[in-house]
Curated annotation (Swiss-Prot):
GTP binds at residues 19-26, 76-80, 131-134. GO terms for cellular component: cytoplasm. Residues 131-134 are annotated as: G4. Its main location: cytoplasm. It catalyses: GTP + H2O = GDP + phosphate + H(+). Residues 10-201 form the tr-type G domain. GTP hydrolase that promotes the GTP-dependent binding of aminoacyl-tRNA to the A-site of ribosomes during protein biosynthesis. Residues 169-171 are annotated as: G5. Keywords: Cytoplasm, Elongation factor, GTP-binding, Hydrolase, Magnesium, Metal-binding, Nucleotide-binding, Protein biosynthesis. It is found in: Cytoplasm. This is Elongation factor Tu. The gene is tuf1.
Length: 391
């Protein structure tokens, strides 16, 4: 039989399982692949290979599956620390998450922590799978746990009352026993994910943005800025804005070049050189961005959610204290900034994850959800995400 061709006719959504250790995230992931994808056994998922994202080693398992209407890429992490790192670095972006809660235990500390992290790093939607319902005989107890989950979600600004909660047993689904709480619950879960988690806007449909990686001048033609287009489309003749580091200014794109060929336009994912009108060689630099005018603003103060590397991961060997001044690496450049720790936090140990405020010495084109690395002399010591812009 000929190999099946990958059809790109369904919209693509990135998703993942989150929740407390041993509540059944990996079993649920395996069960979903049994009914909607190419079956992957528990140990194939649990033995996730290590990956490096922004200099940090993370173990994540990736599976894919399809519903009637969509194609899903699903990420599952073996350990709690992997989740923290994954969510903060955005190594595996999530358009939505399936929160797995053991019905017998109810929400536990990591349940809370994953919901908080989801809020901080901008996971917009969650659907709940209440697992191991066969271990609870009392229907009133199940109702109490459901209420508790909804209240917890609401306390972190998720719409707790509206979020779908599916009850079932991932193990029964895996073993093909007790269809009602097994297979049926998995089908109900994917139906809920299909319906409740919206398809994200594709990168090309978002406003244009390209981080500037390099700048050079072509005699007689002007200045060219090169980089990989992060989102949107740029057409020859369009007005663009140069944002970050220095006061913003406007220019016009007079040419788009890729692989030494001239194009009418460049789009998300393309590595291009953009020819800019009226900009001299010193008028634009690495670390700035070219974007649709007015779509992104420069900022210096923000609240961050960050993970600090352990010594074993190549991070610091010692804690840091208030007024710590590392470099913050945004997109293509380092900017020095001062860390202001939250009240009651005296020091931060390697391996911690926490939120703190940062003030940069120069403005950077910034939006919520933007990822960055924390560096000391070119060595990565942490990773973070902008959770809120202050100024």
């Amino acid at each position: 039989m000929a190999k099946a061709k990958f059809e790109r006719n369904k919209p693509h959504v990135n998703i993942g399982t989150i929740g407390h250790v041993d509540h059944g995230k990996t079993t649920l992931t395996a069960a979903i692949t049994k009914y909607f994808g190419e079956f992957r056994a528990y140990d194939q998922i649990d033995g996730a290979p290590e990956e490096r994202a922004r200099g940090i080693t993370i173990s994540t398992a990736h599976v894919e599956y399809e519903s009637e209407s969509r194609h899903y890429a699903h990420v599952d992490c073996p350990g709690h620390a992997d989740y923290v790192k994954n969510m903060i670095t955005g190594a595996a972006q999530m358009d939505g998450a399936i929160l797995v809660v053991n019905a017998a235990d109810g929400p536990m500390p990591q349940t809370r922590e994953h919901i908080l992290l989801g809020r901080q790093v901008g996971i917009p939607y969650m659907v709940v799978y209440m697992n191991k319902v066969d271990q609870v005989d009392d229907p009133e107890l199940l109702e109490l746990v459901e209420m508790e989950i909804r209240e917890l979600l609401s306390s972190y600004d998720y719409p707790g009352d509206d979020i779908p909660i599916i009850k079932g047993s991932a193990l029964a689904a895996m073993n093909g026993t007790d269809k009602e709480i097994g297979e049926d619950s998995i089908r109900a879960l994917i139906a809920a994910v299909d319906e409740y988690i919206p398809t994200p806007a594709r990168a090309v449909d978002q406003p244009f943005l390209m981080p500037v990686e390099d700048v050079f001048s072509i005699s007689g033609r002007g200045t060219v800025a090169t980089g990989r287009i992060e989102r949107g489309v740029v057409k020859v003749g369009e007005e663009l804005e140069i944002v970050g580091i220095r006061p913003s200014k406007k220019t016009v794109c007079t040419g788009v070049e890729m692989f030494r060929k001239l194009l009418d336009q460049g789009e998300a994912g393309d590595n291009v050189g953009l020819l800019l009108r009226g900009v001299d060689r010193d008028g634009i630099e690495r670390g700035q961005v070219l974007c649709k005018p007015g779509s992104v603003k420069p900022h210096t103060k923000f609240e961050a959610e960050a993970y600090i590397l352990t010594k074993e991961e190549g991070g610091r060997h010692t804690p840091f204290f208030a007024n710590y001044r590392p470099q913050f690496y945004f997109r293509t450049t380092d900017v020095t900034g001062t860390v202001e720790l939250p009240e009651g936090t005296e020091m931060v140990m390697p391996g911690d994850n926490l939120k703190f405020n940062v003030e940069l010495i120069a403005p950077i084109a910034m939006e919520e959800k933007l990822r960055f690395a924390i560096r000391e002399g070119g060595r990565t010591v942490g990773a973070g995400v902008v959770s809120k812009i202050i100024a």
